Amino acid sequence: MNKWSRFKFTPNLPLGANGERVTGSKAHIELSKEAAKEGMVLLKNENNVLPLAAGSKVALFGKGTFDYVKGGGGSGDVTVAYIRNLYEGLKLQKEKISIFEELCDYYRNDIKKQYATGAVPGMTIEPDVPAELLSKAQAYTDTAIISICRYSGEGWDRKSVIDPNNKALWDYEREMTEKSAELFKDGDFCLSVKEKEMIDTVKASFKNVIVILNVGGMVDTSWFAYDDQIQSALLALQGGIEGGLAAAELLVGDGNPSGKTVDTFAKSLDDYPSTYNFHESRNYVDYTEDIYVGYRYFETIPGAAEKVVYPFGYGLSYTTFDVETVSAGVVNSNCTSETNKLYAKVRVTNTGKFSGKEVVQVYIAKPQGKLGKPAKELAAFEKTRELQPGESQLMILTWEINDMASYDDLGKVKKSAYVLEAGSYDIYVGTSVRDVTKADYSYILNHDVITEQLSAKLVPTSLPKRMLADGSYEALPQSEPVDTDYSAIGNIDPSLTEGVAPCQRAIPYFRFADGMAKNGSHDIMDVVEGRITLDEFVSELSIDELIHLLGGQPNTGVANTFGIGNMPEYGIPSVMTADGPAGVRIAPEVGICTTAFPCSTLLACTWNPDVLEAVGRAGGEELKENNLALWLTPAICIHRSPLCGRNFEYYSEDPFVTGKLAGAMVRGIQSNNVGATLKHFALNNKETNRKNSDSRVSERAAREIYLKAFEMIVKNDNPWAIMSSYNMINGYRASESEDLLTGILRDEWGYEGMVTTDWWTCGEHYKETKAGNDLKMGNGYPDRVKKAYDKGAISRSEMETSVKRILGLILKLD
């Protein structure tokens, strides 16, 4: 096939064997199910109620039995051929268990009626169970399964607040916020009144009670964790197209849960330090908890540990394991300090009666020193293979010594530097942040070591204070904020940010032709075939042609998130993008069903990079088969708060596990010669007023927590694209931040790929380009960029730099 033939939008050419399509194929759907099974977390299993014994009879309670949520809303939604709910999954286990059908008929009909009146999955009302049905269910069995579901999505958060001054709300954002507030008075972290009533009824009526959580993120688990009337609980999260079957197979013992939590589950929403200021202001969020996010807070701050129900890294199994640290130390004592690694050699033995997998986790306890540190930080992890009863596996986990350094933003040791402070770096090995044993070896430093000297970036001007390791706060320097709304060409018309489709050069299909006049004498194929360099090609383009390439292009083929390129007179194809984090998103009206994979948080709970790489590879195949070029995933913002409406499409509260697993996703996607897009860069931890909210954060917290996963993936996995976020960071729009997009991303990390805005940001296009944001989506503002050029506010050189990155991405495609 000739280069870029797919982007002519001839009929989509199948990638499978014997001319079969891989999109939505049985193999990809099976992969989705197996990935979901590997990530689901067994939270509780008293008296070994699970797995269900052969011949068991069960009664299914809760609207979630039928109101199954495969994934979140917005860009994370996927068009699929079907969705397998929990009931349907359990019905396929008919040779092992039987179900009280009359109760299921009641729930099915109720949910069907609610859908008919406009309800969406996960946002239905929990119905009352008739007393007669309850009595029949009791007579049928002593075992009940309760399913609790939750749905959230792009544009609204999980404790609903509508900003009356926000004129940029799309209709569905307002509607879903209002519906969530109606169903969950205290936010959907908590049970609704109707859910509480149903659960109390079930507990009083059945001997064995099992809970299934079909949710997208952190919820209240205290109601079952400490209740002796509830024996078992499975954190099933949002499992994609076959999520109901994945959960059902685990319930009957066709597979053994091996997932681990990637977030800390606290007793109350108020126990998270981010809660009190999440909705403090429509205009800003103060990240006063600083680096103490998730387990870094709960394991460090005095009194916080007792607030935890299920800790980070936690998960039970149907079997038991013995984890022994054989040895630990320096990998090679002859190495220079810049390349030294530490290791832990660990033996894992299956001591139970079921085959299964275990996750070995290594944490570092650093000296508090002058900077203060979390009590423990994840340094390495690895999942075993499937171990049979009595079988052992010897594992060697390694990590860079320099990765244990902390960033000094105030000059307590060395300003704007990563520092290893003198003292003992203790190694803890185990199966969760709490179930760990201290290794015999500690890494000792007798003096402070500067591992990397940088310069101040993203310095806050208005963050008043930040938390310290003892729970107190230190005041931070304040300065006069800069007027970031200034534009050399006047204010932006608000209509430009309201989702206007690309209208410049609206060419409906790609064609190799000379139908348009062009400024240059060469074709892009001259670059492909080595006759001229990319620099030479770009130097021949006119200003108008450069500006054209800086903006998004009309949809072609099956795309619905627009494309890039689109200059047929130069042979430059129009290559298309596609959402989203749980599968390739194609508009329903197109008629193509793709594979809905588990939500990102569930994939992260696998703690298995091989699974993430396989899912990425399959998704990349579906992208390519449908003539799409750039997948707008993975999304890797940190789970700062349970309230964020898009936590389901992000990975974890921990940047290390996020970076390792999302990096594997990137490798899988790009193995198909299509691009992955890291998003949202950065600190997009809130959906309410997301286009204007200012994330006020210390430079240390930004670097150590919120940028760290991006840094890991940029340095290790070479993503083709990065998407900047809507929000502001310390007074500057992320899409206009030279500190972020050039100073940190390119100068410090060495990134050479393309940066795109999120779709229809409120940023000024020319300022975004100057900052290092190469592409404005879904469309550019060519007239404003041209006006800025005419006034000298942006140079040709700055535009050429971005155009070369955009064309560089296109040139990677086959």
Q: What feature does the model see in each segment?
A:
Residues M1-D435, A456-D814:
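Glycoside hydrolase catalytic-domain context in secreted enzymes
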Residues D435-A456:
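Short beta-strand elements
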